[in-house]
Amino acid sequence: MVAAAAALSLFSGCGGDTLGMSQTGLDVKWYSELVSTFQESHDMNFKHSTLLGGDIRKIPDEKFEELRGKVDTIFAGFPCQSFSHGGKKDPDDPRGQLFHQFVRATRLIQPKFIIGENVKGLLTRKTQNGGLFLDLILEEFRTIGYTCHYKVFSADAAGVPQSRERLILVGSKEPMADPFPSLRGSPKKVLRDVLRFDMAGAIKVDRELLTEAGVPEEHILVGEGEPIGTPHPYLQLKVSERDVTYNGKRVSTYAFSFGKRKSPVHCEVVDPRICSKTLICTYDHQPRLFVAQKTPEGYYLRPYTIDEIKEIQGFPRDYKLSGNLKQQIVQLGNAVPPPLIREVCAWIHR
């Protein structure tokens, strides 16, 4: 039996890329991750994978050099807050410089393939000198002998029920004529495939709210039961709003619209026929996406459940996560969708 090719995951988070690589037969023997809660989640799901270190900047060269000749693929979902349209765009943010550690590990280990993942915003983000960050990254890899290609994918093309655009970078020392899959054959998933009737965090609303939002009766989840727990404070606030204004103009009576946000101050009642909007790590703090439900007692709205968030990000429902609900949502919001990495890895190892 041929041994599985070994891989190293850098900036692993809770293990989205590790799961994706594992699904293609790669053996992710080593990983690095700074946050202890994320490490715990990774360890619970991949007990055979060894933590190289927490702060990648403190992993000595010698530790990486020991892996030379042993690693087929290095994956790095290096931090994206400096490049994200939703994050702070500070060119001096040290998190935006961590790609240097990806380059260092590659130089010392000399893998066959490298895969990087980041937000689409990296395409346009500039350095303090006015050049593109992406050009700087490509040049640093070119200097150590790796030719890189990049492409933007939407995770829904890989069968993830979420519109989540990510920049994927693939590099190797040998020429790659066709480095990226088309993903056109992946089965399509929408929210209807992952949403389940659940009264956790539900709050009762007037049918008039859903009517104004444009929610069709047939797209409301139906079941029985009483609300469980306390509704999210932000949901309570938005449900109580009346006569919503934006830019000094009244735009609606209620602060909700169906399938899209009517204005930046609106929340969205999700349309189960389509994919979710991008889920970010602040969803627990200020959720803007809600599920409509109905019982014999009336109509309700609730946030996504943690199991739904897992599936919306491409994780199985039984994926283990450490920490409280907020910490779990942060982990998932920061994760790379495993099916996207599975498809890319399967293609380059075909």
Task: Tell what function each PLM region has.
Residues 18, 81-85, 122-125, 159-163, ...:
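Short catalytic/ligand-binding loop motif for oxyanion handling, primarily in non-cytosolic enzymes
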Residues 110-112, 146, 165:
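A short helix->loop->beta-strand "cap" motif at the edges of active sites that frequently abuts
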Residues 146-157:
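Conserved S-adenosyl-L-methionine
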